[in-house]
Swiss-Prot record:
SUPFAM superfamilies: Serine protease inhibitors. GO terms for molecular function: serine-type endopeptidase inhibitor activity. Keywords: Disulfide bond, Protease inhibitor, Secreted, Serine protease inhibitor. This is Chymotrypsin inhibitor.
Length: 56
């Protein structure tokens, strides 16, 4: 699968990945999900792009 900038494909990524709105990793009991996730150190913004925290 093609991923966007600053993303990586993960076969078992967190279903509760950190975002600009919720930057702290939260306790997650949901199953892992297959798909593109932000690279380490990046957060998903409101438009769905992976950005550095200072660009949120």
């Amino acid at each position: 699968e093609e991923c966007g900038p600053n993303e990586v494909f993960n076969t078992c990524g967190s279903a509760c990945a950190p975002t600009c709105a919720q930057p702290k990793t939260r306790i997650c009991t949901m199953q892992c999900r297959i798909g593109c996730q932000c690279q380490e150190g990046f957060l998903r913004n409101g438009e769905g792009a992976c950005v550095l925290p200072e660009n949120c």
